[in-house]
């Protein structure tokens, strides 16, 4: 299963691939986050797409992964949160804006999903710009990392 954009293929990693990502991750916080994602996949096999690491692969350069994202589980209330990151060298090309728009629209087309949310570090202006460009607005709440956003769609 994959989501296709103009320039990328977006797809969830298999459990074995996620284990490799965890083994190769040097940042302790990311290693912990990826481990929790894998545990979510293993605990919720029928809903693993809502816990998996998703890669962002360039169409015109097969095998080149420019970043990744995840959904942070699907709540009983129909709310799913997204998180994302780009590799150095691939920023400022619009890849994340393209991916966030596509995954948000895809998520909202899935059974049980009523709302897509995100949270960013208060100082991560680039990430906030991605959210604003793709139809998110601040919902007035603060999370552990910073301001929270909710998808409102394009006007």
Description of each model-found segment:
Residues 131:
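Conserved active-site tyrosine of GNAT-family acetyltransferases
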Residues 118-128:
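Conserved beta-strand-loop-alpha-helix junction that forms the acyl-donor binding cleft
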Residues 94-97:
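Glycine-rich acyl-CoA binding loop
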Residues 110-119:
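Conserved GNAT acetyl-CoA-binding A-motif
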Residues 1-81, 86-89, 102-106, 110, ...:
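GNAT-family acyltransferases
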């Amino acid at each position: 299963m994959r989501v296709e954009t103009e320039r990328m293929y977006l797809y969830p990693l298999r459990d074995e691939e996620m284990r490799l990502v965890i083994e190769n991750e040097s940042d302790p916080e990311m290693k912990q986050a990826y481990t929790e994602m894998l545990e979510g996949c293993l605990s919720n096999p029928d809903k693993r797409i809502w816990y998996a690491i998703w890669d962002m692969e360039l169409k015109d350069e097969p095998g080149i992964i420019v970043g990744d994202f995840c959904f942070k589980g699907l709540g009983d209330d129909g709310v799913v949160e997204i998180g994302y990151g780009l590799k150095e060298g691939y920023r400022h090309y619009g890849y994340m804006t393209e991916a966030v728009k596509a995954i948000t629209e895809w998520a909202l087309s899935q059974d049980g999903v009523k709302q897509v949310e995100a949270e960013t570090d208060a100082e991560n202006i680039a990430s906030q710009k991605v959210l604003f460009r793709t139809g998110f607005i601040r919902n007035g709440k603060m999370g552990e990392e910073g301001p929270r956003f909710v998808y409102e769609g394009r006007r």
